[in-house]
């Protein structure tokens, strides 16, 4: 496994309202399946495509910090929560990835983790095509939640077909691949 700070950095964002065992399981399985050097949880500030979280951002951040305390190779990035404090402006993934890229440099491989359901809606995300220049995308599948793109003629189908790779591809470039991986159903 890669050393923290140099290997592939996994990024798992979400409202975490509340954080639950499926989030933690996804992180653990992604780290193992994809050989991630580190996995960073990123609590959302103000999600643009979901209802506002019931729990305050500071509480959601504290939940994630507490859950990950003492777990080697796992970290928490408070950036979205801090940026959203005192504003209702949406927290866009592309802005978070731009910040991560500045923080970790142009060469460190970054991997944004998504579930198959979120990936299927990627075209609705703000500046979605720019995500590929900033990070790889790992798409978690489980029974009943497989990837439903690639066979059609949408822009996302074309991106999926052109960028599909494997875990072995992640360390070879800082961004640009789409890597499906299976997780167990809970």
Spans of model-derived segments:
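Nucleotidyltransferase catalytic core that binds NTPs
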Residues: 1-186
């Amino acid at each position: 496994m890669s050393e923290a700070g140099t290997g592939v950095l996994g990024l798992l964002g979400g409202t975490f309202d509340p954080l639950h065992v499926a989030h933690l399981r996804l992180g653990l399985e992604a780290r193992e399946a994809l050989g991630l050097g580190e996995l960073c949880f990123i609590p959302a500030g103000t999600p643009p495509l979901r209802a506002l979280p019931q729990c305050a951002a500071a509480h959601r951040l504290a939940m994630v910090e507490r859950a990950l305390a003492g777990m080697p190779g796992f970290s928490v990035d408070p950036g979205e929560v801090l940026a959203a404090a005192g504003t209702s402006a949406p927290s866009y993934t592309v802005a978070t990835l731009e910040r991560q890229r500045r923080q970790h440099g142009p060469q460190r491989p970054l991997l944004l983790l998504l579930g198959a359901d979120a990936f299927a809606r990627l075209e609705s995300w703000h500046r979605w095509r720019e995500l590929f220049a900033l990070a790889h995308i790992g798409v978690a599948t489980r029974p009943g939640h497989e990837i439903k793109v690639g066979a059609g003629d949408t822009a996302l189908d074309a991106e999926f077909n052109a960028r599909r790779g494997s875990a072995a591809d992640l360390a070879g470039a800082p961004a640009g691949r789409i890597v499906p991986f299976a997780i167990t159903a809970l």
